[in-house]
């Protein structure tokens, strides 16, 4: 399914948040939506997801104009929004999480657990996953929780998935698991909007990019034609230079080394080295 958003405007009182913004997503395309905090990314995607309504502008799916007055209408049109804070219940099995709010029932009115498990298994088969639908969500690592959210979107027949900072709480191996799933979805013609500040990840997984700055679309194109430096410059509006800070004092021998330090759910995969005579900023 092809998406085009054209001339999208949105104001909150006197604050003009989106100024005639355009955005496009092709079938089976992973597009990075980039911008500093407050650039308008969330507002634009909340309009696509039916959470907000634009003041003006058009949303077209496969060339047909659409209006979404609620998230349910957006979802019915094939658009799923996976927020940064995952919407999963740890004390329920995977298959029940997959059907929250849309539980399948028998004629008797009781939950049809068998049918929900079967449908969940079919989605997992489509994605090449070996997860047991009856596994409790609390037993999953962060990457598989993200994958369960993606699976739920596919169960609802989503053709476009919006992912808001999907790798923020993931370790490098977990990120690779999620990226492997995204590559499969690309092959299955599912479009992905990938909202992220991690530009190296954008270069690795995305096909295209769109950059917003101060409510205006300032750049878009193919990822293969730009560098992370280019993307950062588009985002902030000026050249980004790296400065080496510090007192210049000579440091001594290594006194402390941390590698892959993790304490769920507070932090994970922390590396740190401290040397004698050094003041280390954290």
What is the predicted role of each segment?
Residues 1-282:
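Glycine-rich phosphate-binding loops of nucleotide-dependent enzymes
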């Amino acid at each position: 399914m092809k998406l085009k958003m054209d001339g999208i405007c949105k104001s909150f009182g006197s604050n003009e948040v989106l100024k005639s913004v355009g955005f496009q997503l092709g079938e089976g395309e992973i597009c990075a939506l980039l911008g500093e905090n407050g650039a308008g990314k969330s507002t634009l995607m909340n309009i696509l997801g039916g959470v907000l309504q634009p003041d003006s502008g058009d949303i077209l799916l496969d060339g047909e104009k659409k209006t979404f007055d609620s998230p349910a209408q957006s979802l019915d049109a094939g658009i799923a929004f996976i927020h940064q804070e995952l919407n999963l219940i740890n004390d329920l099995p995977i298959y029940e999480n997959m059907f929250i709010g849309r539980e399948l029932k028998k004629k008797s009115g009781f939950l049809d657990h068998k049918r929900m498990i079967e449908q969940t298994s079919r989605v997992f088969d489509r994605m090449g996953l070996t997860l047991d639908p009856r596994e409790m969500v609390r037993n999953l690592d962060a990457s598989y929780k993200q994958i369960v959210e993606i699976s739920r979107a596919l169960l609802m027949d989503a053709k476009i998935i919006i992912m808001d900072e999907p790798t923020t709480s993931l370790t490098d191996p977990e990120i690779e698991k999620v990226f492997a799933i995204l590559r499969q979805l690309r092959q299955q013609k599912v479009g992905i909007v990938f909202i992220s500040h991690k530009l190296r990840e954008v270069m690795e997984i995305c096909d295209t990019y769109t950059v917003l700055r101060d409510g205006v679309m300032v750049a878009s194109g193919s990822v293969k034609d730009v560098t992370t430096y280019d993307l950062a410059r588009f985002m902030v509006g000026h050249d980004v230079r790296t400065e080496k800070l510090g007192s210049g004092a000579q440091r001594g021998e290594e006194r402390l080394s941390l590698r892959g330090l993790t304490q769920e759910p507070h932090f994970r995969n922390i590396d740190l080295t401290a040397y004698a005579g050094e003041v280390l900023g954290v």
